[in-house]
Amino acid sequence: MILRRSLCLLALANAAVCAHAADWPNFRGPTRNGISVEKGWRTTWPGDMPVAWKAEVGLGFSSVVVSEGRAATAGYADGKDGVFCFDAASGAVLWTHRYPAELGDKFYEGGTTGTPTFEGSRLYWLSRWGNLMCLEAATGRVVWEKNIAQETGAPIPTWGYTGAPLVHGDLLVLNVGDAGTAVEKATGRLVWKSEAKDAGYSTPFPLGNLAMFGNAKSYVAVNMQTGAEAWRFRWLTEYGVNAADPVLAGGDVFISSGYGKGGARLKLQGTQPPEEVWKTKALRTQLNAAVFHEGYLYGVDGDTTQKSPLKCIDFATGEEKWSESGFGSGGLVIVDGNLVALSGMGEVMIAPASPSGFKTSARTQVFGPKSWTAPVFANGLLYCRNGRGELVVLNLK
Amino acid sequence: MKRRQFLQYAALSGTSTFLAPFVRSAEPRKLRTALIGSGWWGKNILKEALASGRCLPVALADVDANALEIAADQVQDLSGHKPKLYRDYRELLAKEKPDVVIIATPDHWHALNTIEALKAGAHVFVEKPTGHTVNESRAMLKAAVESGRVVQVGLHRRIGPHHVSGMKFLKSGAVGDVGMVRLFAHSPGDGPEKPAPNEKAPDGMDWDFWCGPAPLRPFSKKLHPGGWRNTLDFANGTLGDWGVHWLDQVLWWSGEQYPKRIFCAGGRPVLGGAVLNDKEQTSDAPDHQVATYEFEKFTCIWEHRRFAGNDTEKHKIGSYYYGTKGVLHIGWKDGWTFYPTTKGGKMEHEDSQLQEPDGHNIQILWADFLEAIDGRKKPVASIELAHRSSVLPLLGMISWRTGRSIQWDAAKEQIIGDPAANALLSRPYRGPWVYPSV
């Protein structure tokens, strides 16, 4: 174990050395943009889908995180939320941490919505209901836990807290309250909080010292150390659902919401409010944020209630380049220049990320609907989960 | 110049350049349309109004400034027209004098909104059930009759294609003699219900106004958005929300206008006792109910469960008509299906034809409303019919509240020999709002 850790440190200099160089330790991956640069995996396979392992994790739409040979996610069953940790290679259950929780089936099946965060020997988890905890990654032992909603008095938004904890130095930055909340990651001690108003559903995204995320009525940027608000960009969306993470591209950022709202490219200006470059109705990301690759955005346009298309839009203009109909409210990641997408109906599709069209090299029906969770790629394994809690891991090595 | 004179001159002149502007103005004037309650469902209806090409969205009213702003954006996207925005529906009606008003507020507001809109001279499309209590519904009917305006109620299952064909099949005698009808809506769910904290209402929302004539409850996400359906101050639970659609179908099929006797049992054994204190609250509608409606020629049972909804039974929502030749299920997304009981009987089925994503038929109901406004027909879900249908779940709720069976005198619209139950035909209003008079 010690040897492996030191190898990983060396890996900073040479990624190929470490077995876990291509970990996916937090929501949206190592660089928080849905991109993995991992090479040497296959974009096509003959015959049946190459299943590495399968598991049942309960109801919900939590994504998977992968670090140092472990894979974790969450789900709900029998009156309890569960945080599950698996051996990434074999799928053996390393530990499970369960606690009483509500189903929360408000206009959908219910279950967990957020995603845990690995950092070193710890796993951090914020539940829909405000249960915030630090678990030992190796054992699942509770290092500390609390209910952050109760402690701060922040209201729980309609579908609960969904943003994953962001580790920043000694702090965990959370999308809780009007403009975030931070606790000490070692102890859970509250460091700063914001007004007791509804949070949005996105994960705090670091921009230097600032974290940017959606609240009920805008995207806000706050200083991560102090909680001081730098700016807010008014972004009124139906039911306060600002869920998609900001997508950073150069010095600009793309924000987008569903319910017909649309997207906008904003020019970032440090601690000054950003300036709108363009707006579009061509890409309205209700749940999963788009992914940026070589001048283009790829993402799902529309709501869970529709058979939404997968689209490519030009980041320079906001214009649509192509639209693949019937994709549904799934998600995608980009791995070494390839779109690795999981449709709302549970079909994996792999295609080169290109503005000229969506030409798949592989398509496999992994499970049934609803799969609203973007797939995760780490160390040659593709992690897919659906709302019912089927977790299917494909081996693309 | 009077219009008729103008027409004569225009005809005489015979030049196309002179005629052109006149031809354009001869197109029917667009109906100045307003929406009261600009949430999810209100916007769905307004979208159909805009899609009809005959309605100009002049104004929106909502007690939530955020909901107004979002709706205004969508209306502008769809129509290119910027509606005027109002917090107070009374001000909207007084200033805009709309031709048509859509009412999609929670149930406890339907009566006051509708009556005021009719007084302002508008035709009204109001959501089901008509009233929150029986006498509100009666007052709405009275106001509609006095105004001479068209009132269409959002009972889109009166016109939905598979309901129309299912009814035709049923009335053809193909199901035989029907002696019993079972209506139901089941969903999966868990218990006990955990209270949600009371909160400050969101910025921009006038919560006192939202509660209006109903008791002023503390704001909670249990209530808004959508959850008010299961809080009895504002609605009547699943029986009021879903039951009215299916009970309406029973009146349509049978031609009977009312049941003689009603008994309803139910409770919250799964969700647990209702909570309302200064810190938190739960919903308070029953998690299940069984209501028996005794008609002249058949018995009708309503049944809902907000737990244990799975595939044990083939259908989860809709109606079973039990006849001597078989069982007809008329459902929602699953269309209608006939299951014969006779040897050699043929199973028959027709798919639903619904508008997605929300599975309704508002588009054709709106078209029917416009035809009625044009004077070509009576609206298919008229206030007269919808009043009788809406009374049924409301009487079911009164039986459930009093814990005894009630007998309905439809001519007098009174419960026979039960003053305590009759008292529940109305309810006290919170001032300054005044209960409408019948």
Locate each region found by the language model.
Chain B
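Short, solvent-exposed turn/loop segments enriched in Gly/Ser/Thr/Pro and often Arg
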Residues: 64-67, 86, 106-110, 130-132, ...
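N-terminal glycine-/serine-/threonine-rich beta1-alpha1-beta2 phosphate-ribose binding loop
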Residues: 1-126, 132-150
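A contiguous active-site-proximal alpha/beta segment in oxidoreductase catalytic domains
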Residues: 123-125, 130-209
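Generic alpha-helical segment signature
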Residues: 38, 159, 359-363
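Structural recognition of the beta-strand scaffold that forms the well-ordered cores
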Residues: 33-35, 57-61, 102-103, 125-126, ...
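A broad, structural surface signal
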Residues: 8, 47, 69, 73, ...
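Contiguous beta-strand/loop segments that form the cofactor/metal-binding neighborhood of enzyme cores
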Residues: 164-165, 177, 182-184, 188-384, ...
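Secondary-structure transition/capping motifs at alpha-helix termini
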Residues: 52, 81, 143-149, 172-176, ...
